Structure formats: structure tokens, C-alpha cells
Amino acid sequence: MLLEHLLIILWMQLTWVSGQQLNQSPQSMFIQEGEDVSMNCTSSSIFNTWLWYKQEPGEGPVLLIALYKAGELTSNGRLTAQFGITRKDSFLNISASIPSDVGIYFCAGQ
């Protein structure tokens, strides 16, 4: 019998460019184990680098994926991130979510 776990993935905003605003969506989500998850960051400014982090309770942020080129698509296990062609957005996808995916996810542009 397969147990389904309710996962809560929360994320917040982080930007490294003074005065720049990043918009992330969704702000929070509830998903079932095994579901795919998509998150995105957008900005009115152009960035040369997009970074995705995860922070678990009681821990510091950990870099998951760094993107350096417009249009770049990078995978790391079940994680896939893309740097938008316009250099104003980035997307993070988690396939087949598992309970250890619960955490706070940050995007950063610089």
C-alpha cells in the first residue's frame, strides 16, 4: 500500500540587485507526493544570472541550480531549471515530488 504525504512547499523572494523586485509564483502550494511542481520568477529587469536555492527548517539556504545563459536549461536529478530567453524570468520544476522536497525555495537574479 502506497502512503501519500501532503507536501507543503513555501517560497519567498530574494534579490541581490539593489532596488530590483522579483515576483515569484505561486507564493505557496500544497501538493501530493508524486506530483510535479512548477515555480517561476519574473522581473522587469534583465539579469545575467539566475540562482535557485532551497532552505530547510533550521538550516541555511543551499544552492540547487545556477543558470548563466539566456535560454539555458539545466537538470539536477528531479530538478529542472530554465533561464528565460528575455533574461527576465526563470522557472524551476520538480518532478515526482517526495517528502524531502518540503522547504522554502528562493530565486535570485543578479
From Swiss-Prot:
Gene Ontology CC annotation, any one: T cell receptor complex
Disulphides: 41-107
Subcellular location: Cell membrane
GO biological process: adaptive immune response; response to bacterium
InterPro entries linked to this entry: Ig-like_dom, Ig-like_dom_sf, Ig-like_fold, Ig_V-set, TCR_alpha_variable
Alphabetical list of Pfam families matching this protein: V-set
Species of provenance: Homo sapiens
Domain Ig-like residue range list: 20-110
Glycosylation sites: 40, 93
Subunit-level organization: Alpha-beta TR is a heterodimer composed of an alpha and beta chain; disulfide-linked. The alpha-beta TR is associated with the transmembrane signaling CD3 coreceptor proteins to form the TR-CD3 (TcR or TCR). The assembly of alpha-beta TR heterodimers with CD3 occurs in the endoplasmic reticulum where a single alpha-beta TR heterodimer associates with one CD3D-CD3E heterodimer, one CD3G-CD3E heterodimer and one CD247 homodimer forming a stable octameric structure. CD3D-CD3E and CD3G-CD3E heterodimers preferentially associate with TR alpha and TR beta chains, respectively.
Signal peptide per UniProt: 1-19
Protein name (Swiss-Prot/TrEMBL): T cell receptor alpha variable 35
